[in-house]
Amino acid sequence: MTIQGCYKKMGADYEDVLKRLYSESMIRKFARMFLTDDSYPKLERSLKEENVEEAFRAAHTLKGVCQNLGFTNLYQPTYELTEVLRAGTLKGAKEWFDRVTEQYNITIEAIRAVQ
């Protein structure tokens, strides 16, 4: 699969990220780097530990990475989760985290399919 096909599969905004990164090879490079980003595992762990502060930081980081890479499919639920956690509560966090997880898995699967 091409990187453009990857973005299409995950429902992300390839054209937007192309404006920022200028080339398909740069997009591919940074998308692959996302596979080693630790913000999602930190978010998952922090939520299990009910550590709102750490969960907020991890969600905020993940949100920023998604925005920079044009992963709009993952950005939106991560944004919503970040706002829930910003209020200092876990109320509603599980539901948003479930949506984040769904989109995260779609994103990871699509990136791994890039040749």
Predicted feature descriptions by range:
Residues 1, 23-24, 71-75:
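Short, structured coil/loop segments at alpha-helix boundaries
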Residues 11-61, 91-115:
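Long, amphipathic alpha-helical coiled-coil segments characteristic
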Residues 3-5:
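Intrinsically disordered or compositionally simple regulatory linkers and C-terminal tails
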Residues 39, 51, 55-58, 66-86:
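Short, well-ordered alpha-helical segments
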